[in-house]
Amino acid sequence: MEHVTEGSWESLPVPLHPKVLSVLRELGFPYMTPVQSATIPLFMKNKDVAAEAVTGSGKTLAFVIPIEEILLRREEKFKKSQVGAIIITPTRELAVQIEEVLSHFTKPFPQFSQILWIGGRNPGEDVARFKELGGNIIVATPGRLEDMFRRKAEGLDLASCVRSLEVLVLDEADRLLDMGFETSINTILEFLPKQRRTGLFSATQTQEVENLVRAGLRNPVRISVKEKGVAASSTQKTPSRLENHYMVCKADEKFNQLVHFLRNHKQEKHLVFFSTCACVEYYGKALETLVKGVKIMCIHGKMKYKRNKIFMEFRKLQSGILVCTDVMARGIDIPEVNWVLQYDPPSNASAFVHRCGRTARIGHGGSALVFLLPMEESYISFLAINQKCPLQEMKLQKNTADLLPKLKAMALGDRAVFEKGMKAFVSYVQAYAKHECNLIFRLKDLDFASLARGFALLRMPKMPELRGKQFPDFVPVDVNTDTIPFKDKIREKQRQKQLLEQQRKEKTENDGRRKFIKNKAWSKQKAKKEKKKKLTEKRKREEGSDVEDEDMEELLNDTRLLKKFKKGKITEEEFEKGLLTSGKRSTNKADLEISDLEDDC
């Protein structure tokens, strides 16, 4: 394990290019952070590095600067289509951020070109841009980069372009694996030359990360950077200048407490984390209405094309609120975030650390607050032990305004709000059921009535988790929710059209059902007629056909004899004798009838 020091950039054992030093001064970074002073010299001496450091410790510059220096020291100049470095990162937002930082360092060196490959963009346009402008340094998300390696239709042969690769960086490696990119990473590694320098950067060390180190790095130097002033025996994973708080309140008090807090901190910059995309959509809309005089924006993983624009816009704000999911929890560097508010605790403990790390970055101060239900209070000690992350209690604010009736009124006035509330509640319950810390976050202990009031629901939704449960403490509104219209006239017109189509469909089905019932009655009438016809024929036979009657009698006698024989009541000899007697009787009768007929003639 390397000894970690820090100092000025000029104190590095391998000198940096004067233009690189100039950019560092312009950006306001006169000194290195511990992870930078530990990593940069090793990277520049052709070592593979696996660096673990707390979030917000300056890991981005720890690989951007070595990339720049390594490419500058290459004797042969790069052609525009030759790739010298690849940086892989788990999310679009982080990729955009890294590409922005990188652009400061490539600007003084026009011989280098860089390109950003992320989802949410047209891949054909990415290929065209690469062929036109080149990309000596690629910043990409795993899925898009894998797609580019496999893409042949547009005439791109990326496998040939990466033969000149000098450096590969895997940023937020633990998150890359958590998000299911392991297969994509392994596919990408197969295309890359073995003779390269590889850097793996992570805030947490897991077994999966260790496996990736063994697969992708050659004799790596392992670097673990602790917070200054933290005891060696400790493994604190949050910045030392971060103040961590918690507030215990009931589910139907949380929203009022959140709004009260935001109204009292309008001049500051906040990230508000929710557990699901649906919760972001619902509460983001509610906060826009109830917290006036402050810019409120929403971002989550299901946004395909708006995310980058929203992210870049929020970064530029001096104050504002970004309502988000964990898509914003890792590696994202948003300038001067004052508070990280966790309305819902994250699904795992490591995500808690990463959420908090969006503030108090690179030596700046910052604060974080997590809202907990009374049944979740043991999570505080769990974080202190598991993540070495102590929390201080923040008392409930008294005399807060009750905003839930206003939220209900919003739902009654606009079907969009009503539907978003229902979806948010369902998604929250489903996410809660899958919580990693299920000994603390137990679904069976959840107060669903209080939770539904906290979501300002008009009625309880139908879902498997609530089947068979009674909620005497929850009073649904005395309104037929099917009649609630959309405020958007176009959406309401579409809804009414769908309702009419549904009514026509139901009418058609009902008519078909009635027709089936009528057909069934007709069948009964037909059967009745058949029965009547048979009775008539029988009567006619009895009246006009003595021969047929005798034949029937003979058949019945033969049947009776056969039954007696099978049951053992008569012998075989008696059975045959009976048959002969029956036949003679019929013959005599027939002969008599024929003679009578001849006499009549």
UniProtKB/Swiss-Prot annotation:
Residues noted as binding ATP in the record, renumbered to the chain: A53, V54, T55, G56, S57, G58, K59, T60
Reactions catalysed, as given in the entry: ATP + H2O = ADP + phosphate + H(+)
Basic residues bias (residue ranges): 515-538
Keywords: ATP-binding, Helicase, Hydrolase, Nucleotide-binding, Nucleus, Phosphoprotein, Ribosome biogenesis, RNA-binding, rRNA processing, rRNA-binding
Compartments, record wording: Nucleus, Nucleoplasm
Disordered: region residues: 502-553, 576-601
Entry's EC annotation: 3.6.4.13
Region (Important for nuclear localization): 534-563
One GO MF term attached to the UniProt entry: ATP binding
Motif (Q motif): 9-37
Any Pfam family matching the protein: Helicase_C
PROSITE patterns reported in the protein's UniProt record: DEAD_ATP_HELICASE, HELICASE_ATP_BIND_1, HELICASE_CTER, Q_MOTIF
CDD domains: DEADc_DDX55, SF2_C_DEAD
Top-level taxon of the source organism: Eukaryota
Domain-level remarks: The Q motif is unique to and characteristic of the DEAD box family of RNA helicases and controls ATP binding and hydrolysis. The C-terminal region is required for DDX55 nuclear import and association with pre-ribosomal complexes.
Oligomeric and partner information: Interacts with 28S rRNA. Interacts with double-stranded RNA substrates in vitro; the interaction stimulates ATPase activity.
The protein's role, per its UniProt record: Probable ATP-binding RNA helicase. Has ATPase activity and is involved in the maturation of precursor large subunit rRNAs.
Protein name per Swiss-Prot or TrEMBL: ATP-dependent RNA helicase DDX55
Species, as recorded: Bos taurus (Bovine)
